[in-house]
């Protein structure tokens, strides 16, 4: 027996070593898994005495090494509170060291803390008083992080690999298009299947132009599924998920959410939540799942990019863990949290199960499982919950429609199964004084109308006759909706608020999707409307103008996820107009494309999928040529056939004249001034001064649409052929004069416009050189 054993254990007078109470079995009894009485009789135990074993000693459990955390450290650290006298003030050059106020998450380390985000104070407030088990404990996270709790990792190794993977993923469309066999490549195990969407999808639209033989192919083999290791354990995730920022940062983010997001998407009853949040009552705290989700959205609309990305990643990780772990048992709150999580998108790695499309589907499943799609007529239903359900249902419908239009995927909700009564102003009681009730009501009407139009116009089993009639009915319904908008929601020449902007962006995006030519035009040769070119051009102009106004006023950050895809739709239309033989229209398209490009660059600061669209246009060689052609002095011709038709056709009472470029000062300036080689702005490009679509800084949105007096138009009840397409566009001031130049000559170019869309395949070069997988 070792001397250590003798020294560590007291001995009785008869030479039998006594163990302290609570000791475990000896090594032999432990191995044989029999009861050992060493704790009572001492060593050797009775079993060892009987067996004649002299080496009886207590079995010592192997010391478990501390679990090495390889979780990315939270790159944010708190400075000491102002009233702390014990903490010395640090000079700017002094590195911040962990202290009692550092975040509760185990894994913070000074040497890898990002200096950019050092000012963001993600910590557990030591003053929090939440003690509910499902919420926050006041002593959780206020403990100092000691040396034994801090672990090391290879700094930057995982991040470098992640950046390389993301760069490859952004160019995965190049592989899909350039590889001739990609359409027939087997989707094997470990490879992602890419669904390009139905006929309405931008992605499907471009694929059909490029591949005539793949008309019936909607699934393609994508990149290999990346393998990621589990970065943390459950104990650390729990501690992290229950961690809140210090009060100052939390207050700022909560206030930002209720000021900039909840008024237009009243997911949460502001009065009730803020009462819980301000009272800090342990008996009635705000749900931790909801609070973390609000902090996520608040960070999106307030913080600068580097800090915003770090904060959103942290908050999203916490919200998702709480959501998946079913910490919150109230399913209403789970619907609310899922809708709020649509404000965060993971990297380009996944556009199916890690973005708004996924979370809208999750919210829809829970909501329909709860029965939110049915009208709660029971008198026993709590009025507050009845109002909340109705609001949540229609916001869910809005998100579902917008994300479905963005990707060309089926909706998660079938409105044929719903009988929820329309929203009324009384449904917004308790949502705060800033709630935009009129916006939510009219936007819900639009999003309720769109699914029926899509089904009748683009349904797989719809006859050609019904498809043609659906276009007429859709225009009438949309025009009636537009004419009934209140003045507060009509298009304005300036000071466009995010709510009316989102409404008109969605509306004009749908107009383009509804009226642009189908790539397989032979199958739909007789179902075009008589003014499709004007409608698409006007809608694209409105979209570009709205984005410019929001960009100049720093309001792009308030747009929801679908705003990126709306701008993508408009840029496809403007891309076609760049190739018009009419130089006036081509110059106008150049201005709009320039403005839209800068708006897309700004959107890429907030939404990762905007980067891939930006690269799609940036890498196009034919696009650069078209941009140069749009500014050249020589008239461009689409084809000899079209030029002869436009100049010699006797049935055309207004042949398209060849404009004198010198007669227009704007065009003359664009041609005579030296222009540098055009480059679509990218995230890596140097910052440029904001550009506008004309020399006039405050050009009205409606300057791209011929003037009309919309207020005096009666509701539409006449046949389609008598419908004035201008009724599809409503403005605040019906007497406002509108510059008609952009539309001059466009009706005569209707056939050319269609040919550019689906015969010349103007977007095929973008697919060959770009890199985007979203529909």
Curated annotation (Swiss-Prot):
Keywords: Activator, DNA-binding, Metal-binding, Nucleus, Transcription, Transcription regulation, Zinc. The keyword Nucleus applies. PROSITE patterns: ZN2_CY6_FUNGAL_1, ZN2_CY6_FUNGAL_2. Gene3D superfamilies: Zn(2)-C6 fungal-type DNA-binding domain. GO terms for biological process: DNA-templated transcription; positive regulation of metabolic process. It holds the Pfam family Fungal_trans. Residues 630-644 have a biased composition (Basic and acidic residues). Residues 1-20, 126-159, 630-699 are annotated as: Disordered. InterPro entries: Amide_Lactam_Regulators (IPR052073), Transcription_factor_dom_fun (IPR007219), Zn2-C6_fun-type_DNA-bd_sf (IPR036864), Zn2Cys6_DnaBD (IPR001138). GO terms for molecular function: DNA binding; DNA-binding transcription factor activity, RNA polymerase II-specific; zinc ion binding. Residues 674-689 have a biased composition (Pro residues). The keyword Nucleus applies. Residues 26-59 bind DNA. Residues 1-15, 126-153 have a biased composition (Polar residues). Induction: By omega amino acids. One of its GO terms (cellular component) is nucleus. It is found in: Nucleus. Positively regulates the expression of genes involved in the catabolism of certain amides, omega amino acids, and lactams. This is Acetamidase regulatory protein. It comes from Aspergillus oryzae (strain ATCC 42149 / RIB 40) (Yellow koji mold).
